[in-house]
């Protein structure tokens, strides 16, 4: 039998243990009604080195005083922010959501973020005056006026998805008519396109806003985690990571927001631009279990950036890059490409620093750029001025995208420019330009070609059907492409290398299903092509591509086809494999792709 005193002591100890257990589960619980109040309390918790913060469930609503984002969190380390049941509602569409800078091992969990006022607009096209190059658009109730110049997208009123077979609509001036009706003057090249694309009185239109900011940003961060977060009505990207050591983890949903106040129609889009965007990270991101839909641009782009070579001799290079953006450090690998995007050489950086002379190229803005010098570990071949310099070590190498759903959006499901990546078990459906493209983009200054990719067990369905890519002059001939950024000028080394495309399903895709260009050591094995070429398609025909072929290979070496099959092909499939110029060692061209006989 326990004495009363001992019993009280035991109960007291148990209470301490329970309290301690609670403290370990949530060191601090904070309440807030506005973003300003929440920001102050989170920074105070970080200053006090609190490891776990629980935000009390509820709606935190308002703008941001003296900053561009509702929350700006800098320098946090080893901190968990549990926001389950919390809604962060922005009232100013020009403000971003959560911005984390220079953070290490920070977890944000359970938050719902959205803009109450959409950072875009939408309505119905009433008519088109071809002589005046002017659309007349009635903006839906509850949505803002269109910006003075931007880009719009046509939507099918029945499916409320991007209208098939049309171009984006670029415009440069807006006139207020009456009520919610506006005149929108389109660019000079648009009237001829709209003659065939537009159905006045029926077509819906969504128009990008230009004043918004990122929903969630990880800037120069490392080892951070975004878990069970939902984003709606994003101002630019849903999630952005920029620079830093990287290795961040993402599990989130980007989807359509609620109807704004006074509206009678649901939003047509979920974000103004990309669902996710990674640029300049040393270690690539991991995206797992994400649902990304309704965005106006790519779902998952991963890249670094180029520098411009101004002079080269022996082991020394001079190059120009943006101010405060010299990404090349000793020990990093570098790759060089000629002005026509052909691979020239690779090496390792020994030393780098500011150039001892200022080249001052007259066509480049001196106030935004800095000239640097670099010494490599080996002699380089002749490198022409205007060549591009990149490193795979700041392009998100080692990225993983697994078990994600990407659907019903403009542009590309994946836009990959990184090495050592894994893309597996994803569903990509309704991407208007392509399900996946691996390519550098010299015009956007985004690097580079990819090496050592594995793309397996994914489903690509109903992609490459709008945004101009169905036209004969399309610059994207394939619904799935590993390619150069421009038509190749001939072999001078291969950009893409060692890529495995295994066990994927390509379903309901018209035109060329797969395009391989500027590639070496590629394996295409065990893929299924279901119901291809059911409808006529001229995608890329005017540029010399054959959209009647299932797969097109050009400028390639050591490409292997094995155990790929075509099921229920449509009447417009005329050729399984077309082999273009500058190819060698193509294995399985005869029996590596076969049409499966119906039982």
Feature locations, PLM:
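Extracellular beta-strand-rich solenoid/capping regions of secreted or surface-exposed proteins
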Residues: 39-46, 61-80, 89-109, 117-133, ...
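Short glycine/acidic-rich loop motifs that flank beta-strands on beta-rich extracellular proteins
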Residues: 64-67, 91-97, 117-121, 213-215, ...
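Acidic Gly/Asp/Thr-rich repetitive segments characteristic of extracellular carbohydrate-active
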Residues: 26-54
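Small/polar beta-strand repeat architecture
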Residues: 168-212, 354-399, 407
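The right-handed parallel beta-helix/beta-solenoid scaffold, focusing on the short coil/turn
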Residues: 51, 69, 77-79, 86, ...
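Right-handed parallel beta-helix/beta-spiral solenoid domain characteristic of secreted/periplasmic
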Residues: 27-36, 60-63, 77-101, 107-121, ...
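Ser/Thr/Gly-rich low-complexity blocks that favor extended beta-strand/coil architectures
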Residues: 115-116, 124-128, 138-179, 323-362
């Amino acid at each position: 039998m326990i004495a009363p005193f001992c019993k009280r002591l035991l109960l007291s100890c148990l209470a301490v243990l329970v309290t301690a257990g609670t403290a370990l589960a949530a060191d601090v619980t904070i309440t807030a009604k506005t973003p300003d109040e929440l920001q102050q309390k989170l920074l105070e918790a970080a200053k006090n080195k609190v490891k776990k913060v629980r935000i009390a469930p509820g709606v935190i609503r308002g703008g941001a005083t003296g900053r561009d984002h509702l929350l700006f969190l800098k320098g946090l380390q080893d901190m968990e922010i549990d926001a389950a049941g919390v809604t962060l509602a922005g009232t100013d569409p020009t403000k971003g959501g959560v911005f984390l800078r220079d953070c290490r091992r920070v977890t944000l969990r359970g938050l719902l973020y959205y803009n109450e006022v959409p950072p875009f607009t939408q309505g119905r096209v009433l008519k088109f005056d071809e002589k005046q190059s002017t659309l007349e658009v009635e903006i839906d109730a509850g949505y803002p006026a269109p910006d003075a110049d931007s880009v719009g997208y046509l939507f099918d009123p029945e499916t409320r998805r991007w209208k098939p077979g049309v171009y984006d609509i670029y415009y440069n001036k807006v006139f207020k008519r009456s009520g919610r009706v506006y005149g929108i003057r389109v660019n000079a090249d648009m009237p001829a396109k709209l003659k065939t694309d537009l159905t006045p009185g029926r077509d819906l239109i969504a128009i990008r806003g230009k004043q918004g900011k990122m929903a969630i940003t990880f800037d120069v961060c490392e080892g951070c985690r975004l878990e069970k977060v939902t984003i709606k009505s994003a101002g630019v990207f849903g999630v952005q990571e920029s620079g830093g050591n990287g290795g961040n983890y993402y599990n989130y949903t980007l989807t359509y927001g609620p109807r704004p106040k006074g509206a009678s129609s649901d939003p047509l889009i979920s974000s103004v631009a990309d669902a996710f965007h990674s640029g300049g990270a040393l270690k690539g991101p991991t995206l797992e279990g994400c649902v990304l839909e309704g965005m106006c641009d790519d779902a998952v782009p991963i890249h670094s950036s180029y520098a411009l070579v101004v002079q080269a001799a022996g082991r020394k290079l001079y190059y120009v890059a943006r101010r405060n953006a010299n990404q090349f450090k000793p020990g990093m690998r570098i790759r060089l490409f000629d002005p026509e995007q052909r691979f020239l050489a690779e090496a390792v950086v020994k030393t780098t620093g500011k150039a001892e002379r200022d080249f001052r190229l007259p066509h480049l803005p001196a106030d935004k750029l800095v000239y640097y010098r670099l010494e490599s570990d080996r002699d380089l071949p002749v490198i022409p001025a205007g060549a591009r310099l990149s490193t795979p070590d700041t392009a998100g190498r080692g990225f993983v995208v697994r078990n994600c759903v990407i659907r019903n959006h403009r542009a590309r499901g994946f836009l990959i420019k990184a090495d050592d990546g894994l893309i597996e078990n994803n569903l990509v459906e309704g991407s208007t330009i392509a399900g996946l493209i691996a390519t550098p983009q010299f015009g956007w200054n985004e690097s580079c070609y990819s090496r050592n990719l594995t793309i397996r067990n994914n489903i690509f369905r109903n992609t490459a059907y709008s945004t101009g890519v169905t036209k004969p002059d399309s610059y994207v001939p394939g619904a799935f492409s590993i390619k150069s950024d421009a038509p190749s000028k001939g072999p001078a080394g291969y950009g893409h290398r060692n890529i495995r495309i295994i066990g994927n399903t390509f379903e309901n895709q018209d035109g060329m299903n797969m395009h391989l260009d500027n590639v070496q050591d590629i394996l295409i094995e065990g893929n299924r092509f279901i119901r291809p070429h059911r409808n006529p398609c001229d995608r890329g025909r005017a540029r010399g591509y054959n959209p009647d072929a299932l797969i097109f290979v050009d400028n390639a070496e050591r490409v292997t086809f094995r155990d790929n099959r075509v099921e229920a092909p449509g009447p417009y499939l005329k050729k399984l494999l077309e082999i273009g110029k500058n190819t060698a060692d193509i294995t399985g061209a005869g029996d590596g792709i076969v049409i499966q006989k119906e039982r």
